[in-house]
Amino acid sequence: MYPLIKKALFNLDAENAHQLAIQSLKLFGKTPFSLACSLPDNPTEVMGLRFKNPIGLAAGADKNGEAIDGFAKLGFGFIEVGTVTPVAQDGNPRPRQFRILEAEGIINRNGFNNLGVDVLIENVKKAKYNGILGINIGKNATTPIEHSLDDYQICLRKVYPHASYVTVNISSPNTKNLRSLQYGEALDDLLRSLKAEQAQLSQKFGGYKPLVLKIAPDLTAEEIASVADSLVHHQIDAVIAGNTTLSRDSVAGLPFADQQGGLSGKPLNALSTQLISQLSQELNGKLPIIGSGGIHSVQSGQEKINAGASLLQLYSAMIYQGPDLVRQLVRKISI
């Protein structure tokens, strides 16, 4: 079935195809049908949360939380929506998504296009899904980098009562200077302030919601060690490793490989697994790792678990392989 759907979708511009898929999943979420009902439970506990299985939807697929119920019916053990910013923004000019067909990769320079945090919250409230929901937050492009904390605090305060956990995205390559927040004092200042905000919100709402940091796969070994120290020092609850890459080594010479933006999909797999392995050595079990980036098979997912990940997230591979990949991973990944 999916090969026919894929053929139709791939006749469209990548972003138009994505929007059509979201609208289709939105409709699917309102039907009585589900692809998840025959799946066995493979429960695991991470960050004090119980996941029905370790396979999650990565942020970026459903930026505005429009199709939560539809994605849930594909069999995911958890869903992460966003990245969302304090106010709506258009993102970068189109075209901004490019398929690297030969490598099953995608380059995007979306730039956090979204309808704003308030719209996302309304969509979350409408959803019937009652599983683990992560909300991924970012900064507006017009906010100076020195005022980034303001945007993250605004989003954290608004999404806190509606999320199972909150992910702080400081690793998109498509928002100017955003990745500079991953380093040294800038990272420490951000994490210190957000942990203080988390403590206040925990008291206000009578419940603790884990705080997760999403990092880039392009960090050096020294930078990974520094990030790990900051994560432990500030008692961050988990880390997502990782975001898209600026490297083109795995797709050099292929059509559209020279397009600006972050590369995801199969070509990212080895780099993200290496990041997980290095992080795992540095963290030594002090906080969990959520493996994301390039998962395209049971083997590639299991390699990330074996490298130190406790949970997995995917998105790009579904574009090439369809939703059956989710069910394969749920059935066969061993924690």
From Swiss-Prot:
InterPro entries assigned? Aldolase_TIM, DHO_dehydrogenase, Dihydroorotate_DH_1_2, Dihydroorotate_DH_2, Dihydroorotate_DH_cat, Dihydroorotate_DH_CS
- Where in the sequence is the active site? 172 (nucleophile)
Q: Which GO terms describe its biological process?
A: 'de novo' pyrimidine nucleobase biosynthetic process; 'de novo' UMP biosynthetic process
What is the gene name?
A: pyrD
- Give the protein's biological function: Catalyzes the conversion of dihydroorotate to orotate with quinone as electron acceptor.
Query: What class does this enzyme belong to in the EC scheme?
Result: oxidoreductase
Catalytic reaction(s) noted: (S)-dihydroorotate + a quinone = orotate + a quinol
From the Swiss-Prot or TrEMBL record, state where the protein is found: Cell membrane
Instruction: Please identify the protein, giving its name as recorded.
Output: Dihydroorotate dehydrogenase (quinone)
Amino-acid positions noted as binding FMN in the UniProt annotation, renumbered to this chain: 59-63, 83, 136, 169, 214, 242, 265, 294, 315-316
Q: How does it sit in the membrane?
A: Peripheral membrane protein
> What does the record give as its pathway?
Pyrimidine metabolism; UMP biosynthesis via de novo pathway; orotate from (S)-dihydroorotate (quinone route): step 1/1
